[in-house]
Amino acid sequence: EYTRLISLSDPDPKGSKHYQSFWDITRASLRYALARLGLVHTSANEDALMAQYAQLTAFPENLGVLQALRHRGVATAILSNGSPEMLQSAVHSAGMSDLLDAVLSVDSVRQFKTTPTSYQLVQDHFGFAPADVLFVSSNAWDALGATWFGFTTLWINRQGLPPEAIGPAPQHTGRDLSEVLKVLG
C-alpha cells in the first residue's frame, strides 16, 4: 500500500519528492502492522524480523526451473520494488546468484511497480519488445500492471486466490514456477 501511495502522490515525475527505499517502506510497514495489532515490540525484535526478511529462501522448484531456463539459453531476471541491497541479499541466500542474467531494482527510476516506468526497466535492459517478455509474478496486481504494459504474463497463484477484479487477466496462470517451462514449451 505504501509503494502505491508514494507512486501516486509524488508530484515529481522522476519520483524524487516522496520516494523511499523499499527497505525503509518494509520497516515502516512492519511498525504499522505491529502497532495496529497492539503488539509491543523493541528495536531488537524489529531488527531480527527485518534480518529474516533479508534472508528469504526459494520455493523448492525455483532453482531447478532457473537451471532449466539457463540450459535452454533463456534470459532470466528479477524486476523488484526491492532495493539493490535487499535483492542482492535475497538472491544470494536463495542460491540464485549464478542463475539470473539481471537483477533489476526500481530504485534506479525511483518509481514502484505498477508504474510503466518500472516495467520499462526490463525493456531497457534486454531490448526485447514487451510482447516477447514472459513476465512472471506471484502478485496478481503485478501481473495486471505487467499485462497493461504489454508483457506476456504468468501469474503464479500458489494460494488459489481470485484474480484482480479489474483489467485483463494474465495470459497464463499456474500453481508454481514450473509452469514457466510449460508456457515456454
Language-model features: locations:
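A metal-dependent, Asp-based hydrolase signature
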Residues: 3-47
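Asp-based, Mg2+/Mn2+-dependent phosphohydrolase catalytic module
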Residues: 67, 83-84, 88-185
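Short, acidic loop-to-helix structural element flanking the phosphoryl-transfer center
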Residues: 19, 23-24, 39-78, 88, ...
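A short, structure-level motif marking secondary-structure boundaries and short turns
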Residues: 14-17, 49-52, 71-73, 103-105, ...
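Short amphipathic alpha-helical segments at helix boundaries and their inter-helical linkers
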Residues: 6-16, 55-64, 152
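Short acidic/polar alpha-helix capping motifs at helix-coil junctions
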Residues: 26-32, 50-55, 84-86, 108-109
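A general structural motif at alpha-helix termini
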Residues: 1-2, 49-53, 137
